[in-house]
Amino acid sequence: MADSSESFNIATSPRTGSRRDALTSSPGRDLPPFEDESEGMFGDEVPREEEEDGEELIGDAMERDYRAISELDRYEAEGLDDEDDVEDLTASQRDAAEQAMRMRDREMGHELGRMRRGLLYDSDEEDEDRPARKRRMAERAAEGAPEEDEEMIESIENLEDMKGHTVREWVSMAATRLEIYHRFKNFLRTHVDEHGHNVFKEKISDMCKENKESLVVNYEDLAAREHVLAYFLPEAPAEMLKIFDEAAKEVVLVMYPKYDRIAREIHVRISHLPLVEELRSLRQLHLNQLIRTSGVVTCCTGVLPQLSMVKYNCNKCNFILGPFFQSQNQEVKPGSCPECQSLGPFEINMEETVYQNYQRITIQESPGKVAAGRLPRSKDAILLADLVDSCKPGDEIELTGTYHNNYDGSLNTANGFPVFATVILANHITKKDDKVAVGELTDEDVKAIVALSKDERIGERIFASIAPSIYGHEDIKRGLALALFGGEAKNPGGKHKVRGDINVLLCGDPGTAKSQFLKYVEKVASRAVFTTGQGASAVGLTAYVQRHPVTKEWTLEAGALVLADRGVCLIDEFDKMNDQDRTSIHEAMEQQSISISKAGIVTSLQARCTIIAASNPIGGRYDPSLTFSENVDLTEPIVSRFDILCVVRDTVDPVQDEMLARFVVGSHIKHHPSSKDIANGEEFALPNTFGVEPLPQEVLKKYIMYSKEKIHPKLNQMDQDKVAKMYSDLRKESMATGSIPITVRHIESMIRMAEAHARMHLRDYVVEDDVNMAIRVMLESFIDTQKFSVMRSMRKTFARYLAFRRDNNELLLFVLKQLVAEQTSYQRNRYGAQQDTIEVPEKDLVDKARQINIHNLSAFYDSDLFKMNRFTHDVKKKMIIQQF
């Protein structure tokens, strides 16, 4: 072992022998070779691969290698500054020198830095991931990205330190781009919600199932996880979104390797940007920044092809030049042909050029957000890729995009000096109508909706949820609820369409909350268009033709009924419309389409909407001694197209008036609570005439959307004989009274209302209860339009139909009020003035109750409804007393 050590020391010492021998011969060359090449020092096995790596210099006697040898320890003194007198630098001088060196390095650029780092690598080395890197570089070259070797780019740990650069300059640097790329890719892979679910894994899966190319990223999530990226994004959106798109594409291709056959690019869409700018507040400081604004789409061009990656043919040598990637700001053209060095001419290669979808829209400020006395401002926006056709005229949208400027020669001519036109390059669009869309309903929402449908009184709860701040008017609330749910449209054999929407007409005295009902429906309906008859013309309701300002072609612009397709069109002051304008909606109300033949355009537009109109009677107030047709200035074809007619009368009833006043005052107190009430924790509960708890507005909206989308009731189990007998009875009564004509349309109306009631309960088939409710609503609508003299006898005739789903207490209260009205009229005629108390014999109420098969009245006397209307029962006198 000692011999081995001695041999090791002699062999590994570079200082043995003369200087020339040390420089010209390798150490250990004079040693005898090992007998076994696999046998190393100390008898250890040495792999053969280590022979090329040199000899082992570390051993037990390695200190002897560093002993002093005077003959050999001589070095050249040239270039050494040990003996020069150099003063030590101060701290300020050192900082100044380092600053100067940093400035020099910055001017030399990052290319030199990459080249210097590249010299450290052996050119003969073969990287293990060479095929993958070649493929990645080829893909980046095909996409127009600069060829960069990630291994040669120095990583940045402190991304916030921009070293004096602007955000746009800092983000454009290669090292910064690479760091942002990795951070965003890691964010997409690892971000989870509060339940621990991977957010973007589900989003990417849903996106690929629908063959889309947009991945929506919530800005609030990005800011919470990667605040530096969230800071850079609004300042340099074009550069950041390009990096985001590349990272998102790589993440998608890892999950679905062949998805690039479906979508060449993946676009990251930014939603929930915190700051919302108004269109009129956009200024110069917003240029080239990410903004979020809102407005109404007023104009929309067709979808046009835009050059994305263009290739040119040289007409002289047929060489294909390119690809050239076009940007939004400038057009890229080839200078000369690299094959024949000619300067042209060049023509576009149509086969290899890649196009993308392009659409230009105009958004205008929402009418409710414009200050008094101001005109609404508008701004153009550009939609690219899969954003095209994501909105149409009339939609109120929230738009997130980059605020750009471009050159416009017409503006320079008009202003006399250089002015740039501004445009918004859209990144993300959200319709305000679709915020609660069926696709966005969660599983918890669906479970809650199905659980609500199993409630026995869900129908009454929905009726009570319609305009809960309006007291009474149960018939109007019932009709509007049925109209919101709607029936089922039919098209037997594809030959004749039968509408499924229910049209409602509200007519009555002023001040009876008709317009408030319309406003509430506008909030609850998923898609609603509100207009007034006085401000709406025929073309404003249907459609009109105008010359497009950009293309100078005649274009068709949609009116209110077309914009309300698949929704609700609300028309207030329906009686103020001109007769010519009113007749224009005949086709829309029945066939649900609008035929246009103007300026060489012959087409038909869809208007599949529910129409809810409100009108005032002739002379201002409704006269109960006249029929409905004599009270309203509407033609018979229009009236027959409405399924439900609701007449609202402002009658004088001291008890009802006091209850209404209490309700209004209580509503104001609830919405303006005092500090004392808040401190005491008191809650004001508005009285409810239905006696059930109403649904919250958001829940009702989701319930309606789910039922209209998922439930399609059928008529297999419908009682046809009952509907036929009811129709014949109504025809006979209408001929006798001459109020409103009963036509075959009313049979279809009853069927539609039965389907709507079944849909309200999430039933797949129409049952007897649905038919009974439809008959009851139809009868109430028909009886309310009769003269007062005919109304009472007609209620007796159809009493068994009207009693459906009515509480016995409600029926008894209605009968008791009729007896009180008769007694009041008698006392007024006898004594000349109304008394403070009215007494009705109990026997009269018992006789009336037996006619409707009610025999026990004790529960009615003890009910809250009896006491709420200020009735008391005197058992000794056998009288029912009402105090005013």
From Swiss-Prot:
A motif (Arginine finger) lies at residues 640-643. Residues 47-58 have a biased composition (Acidic residues). Residues 1-61, 120-151 are annotated as: Disordered. ADP binds at residues 515-516. One of its GO terms (cellular component) is CMG complex. Residues 458-664 form the MCM domain. Keywords: ATP-binding, Cell cycle, Chromosome, DNA replication, DNA-binding, Helicase, Hydrolase, Metal-binding, Nucleotide-binding, Nucleus, Phosphoprotein, Zinc, Zinc-finger. PROSITE patterns: MCM_1, MCM_2. GO terms for molecular function: ATP binding; ATP hydrolysis activity; DNA binding; helicase activity; zinc ion binding. The keyword Zinc-finger applies. May be in a phosphorylated state in the mitotic mcm complex. Phosphorylated in the interphase mcm complex. Phosphorylated by the cdc7-dbf4 and cdc7-dbf4b complexes. It is an enzyme of class 3 (hydrolase). A zinc finger (C4-type) spans 314-340. GO terms for biological process: cell cycle DNA replication; DNA replication initiation; regulation of DNA-templated DNA replication initiation. It comes from the Eukaryota. Its main location: nucleus. It is found in: Nucleus; Chromosome. InterPro entries: MCM (IPR031327), MCM2 (IPR008045), MCM_CS (IPR018525), MCM_dom (IPR001208), MCM_lid (IPR041562), MCM_N (IPR027925), MCM_OB (IPR033762), NA-bd_OB-fold (IPR012340). CDD domains: MCM2. Residues 1-16 have a biased composition (Polar residues). The keyword S-adenosyl-L-methionine does not apply. It catalyses: ATP + H2O = ADP + phosphate + H(+). Early fractionation of eukaryotic MCM proteins yielded a variety of dimeric, trimeric and tetrameric complexes with unclear biological significance. Specifically a MCM467 subcomplex is shown to have in vitro helicase activity which is inhibited by the MCM2 subunit. The MCM2-7 hexamer is the proposed physiological active complex. PANTHER family: DNA REPLICATION LICENSING FACTOR MCM FAMILY MEMBER, DNA REPLICATION LICENSING FACTOR MCM2. Acts as a component of the MCM2-7 complex (MCM complex) which is the replicative helicase essential for 'once per cell cycle' DNA replication initiation and elongation in eukaryotic cells. Core component of CDC45-MCM-GINS (CMG) helicase, the molecular machine that unwinds template DNA during replication, and around which the replisome is built. This is DNA replication licensing factor mcm2. It comes from Xenopus tropicalis (Western clawed frog). The lineage of its organism: Eukaryota, Metazoa, Chordata, Craniata, Vertebrata.
